[in-house]
């Protein structure tokens, strides 16, 4: 398996050191007041894009914790939207204050669907007959600015931030918008995708597969033939491996090529800017996601990405709490939270905060209602594991010659994830114990035993999965001078 060395830039440490402690619940501003601030920008014409709250008062924006209220604060009256040109609508989408959500969910399509569902702006745009043509014209003219200083809200529509450009590309790639078979639109889109894709493929220091994938997706859904012309035969460096719940249920885990340092910097910075009262506990990374951190390994060394569905599109996340080590509970006992509507998991800390990996974003400690995820439809779980015994068979002789070394082993060729510990008891006398024991083999699966006295010995073995005893076995061995 690939492991990655992440160089965390100075900017990351500066961001972390400047953050404040989290309050148990974030202060909320009345939505009506926020809307008034967001839209009171003076007289506007049909060609003028929306100026959203973050562009005029970032503090007021970040004081809004719940995601639902951020959507409410970004709403625009239908009368204003209907009077706007399609070009003005696209410009407004380019600087929409929730574009960062494309980095917050396992599947960017979920971010697009959620934004379209909650945003009258996007609904109005999709109702326009010239939507695809105007969108492609403006997308083709827009360049990507990967500088840390680039703002998501600066009103520069010819140079887009990373989050805004990724939103535009995923918006088309998820088939919310299509060329509808129009040759002129398709050709302009193909030319733009080819140019942008070539630039990103050439700059491997700045761009990883993460920045290439949405362009390849557009190419595939529109059948543009760009990837073929550039001889691209692999959309993403991905491995699929099998890991196991504590009680040995198989889980498909994905191992992704890591993001570039610049991509990690920008995504971390975006979430710190959007949620300054949350605390960064680990930088943005493609190594692991919220499910893997909450259910499998709560460590920065984790390098498995776990989806709700396995590689055959079968539900798998529920294996962690279905006849396994976790059980559903009331909120007071909670150790892990699952937010079903947003496919997100979080660890609940003793101070009441949540600790969760914001998918491509950083590992964040935050108040429960201060995140890119809804506060509704949450399920609560606690760890409820007790050590298991039995189930193991020890292979080896039961009659041995005194002072000869004998080998005992476990046949676990289909369980390479287990580790073992051995114990030997001399049953004829309590002490001293007359034997020599050494443990060897891969993961401790072999035991070398030399019985130094006559009598009955009890050989015991314990199997552990990630440190938890899930099985045991024992074997009676009789030692004698000869047989």
Predicted regions and their residues:
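Aromatic- and glycine-rich peptidoglycan recognition patches
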Residues: 349-389
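Solvent-exposed loop segments of extracellular immunoglobulin-like
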Residues: 413-421
């Amino acid at each position: 398996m690939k492991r990655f060395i992440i160089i965390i830039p100075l900017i990351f440490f500066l961001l972390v050191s400047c953050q404040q402690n989290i309050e148990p619940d974030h202060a909320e501003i009345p939505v009506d007041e926020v809307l008034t601030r967001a839209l009171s920008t003076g007289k506007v014409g049909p060609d003028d894009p929306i100026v959203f709250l973050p562009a005029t008062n970032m503090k007021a924006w970040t004081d809004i914790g719940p995601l639902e209220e951020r959507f409410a604060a970004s709403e625009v009256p239908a009368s204003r939207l209907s009077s706007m040109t399609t070009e003005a609508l696209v410009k407004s989408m380019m600087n929409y204050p929730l574009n960062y959500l494309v980095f917050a969910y396992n599947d960017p399509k979920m971010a697009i669907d959620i934004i379209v569902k909650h945003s009258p702006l996007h609904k109005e745009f999709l109702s326009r007959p010239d939507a695809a043509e105007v969108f492609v014209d403006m997308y083709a003219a827009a360049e990507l600015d990967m500088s840390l200083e680039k703002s998501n809200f600066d009103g520069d529509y010819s140079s887009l931030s990373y989050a805004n450009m990724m939103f535009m590309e995923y918006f088309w790639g998820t088939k919310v918008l299509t060329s509808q078979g129009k040759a002129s639109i398709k050709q302009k889109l193909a030319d733009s995708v080819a140019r942008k894709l070539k630039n990103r493929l050439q700059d491997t220091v700045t761009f990883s597969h993460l920045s290439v994938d949405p362009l390849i997706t557009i190419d595939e859904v529109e059948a543009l033939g760009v990837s073929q012309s550039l001889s691209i035969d692999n959309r993403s460096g991905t491995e699929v491996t099998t890991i196991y719940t504590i009680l040995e249920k198989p889980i498909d885990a994905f191992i992704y090529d890591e993001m570039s340092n610049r991509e990690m910097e920008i995504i971390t910075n975006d979430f710190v800017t959007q949620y300054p009262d949350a605390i960064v506990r680990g930088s943005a990374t493609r190594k692991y996601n919220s499910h893997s951190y909450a259910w499998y390994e709560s460590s920065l060394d984790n390098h498995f990405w776990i989806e709700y569905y396995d590689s055959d599109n079968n539900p798998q996340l529920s294996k962690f709490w279905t006849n396994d080590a976790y059980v559903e509970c009331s909120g007071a006992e909670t150790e892990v939270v699952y937010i079903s509507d947003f496919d997100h998991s979080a660890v609940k800390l003793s101070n009441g905060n949540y600790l969760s990996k914001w998918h491509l974003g950083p590992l964040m400690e935050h108040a429960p209602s201060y995140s890119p995820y809804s506060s509704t439809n949450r399920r609560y779980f606690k760890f409820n594991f007790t050590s298991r015994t039995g189930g193991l068979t020890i292979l080896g002789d039961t009659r041995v010659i005194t002072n000869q070394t004998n080998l005992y082993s476990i046949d676990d060729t289909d369980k390479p994830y287990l580790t073992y510990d051995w114990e030997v008891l001399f049953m004829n006398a309590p002490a001293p114990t007359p034997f020599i024991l050494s443990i060897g083999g891969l993961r401790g699966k072999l035991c070398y035993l030399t019985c130094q006295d006559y009598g009955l010995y009890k050989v015991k073995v314990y199997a552990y999965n990630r440190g938890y005893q899930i099985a045991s076995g024992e074997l009676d061995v009789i030692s004698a001078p000869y047989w």
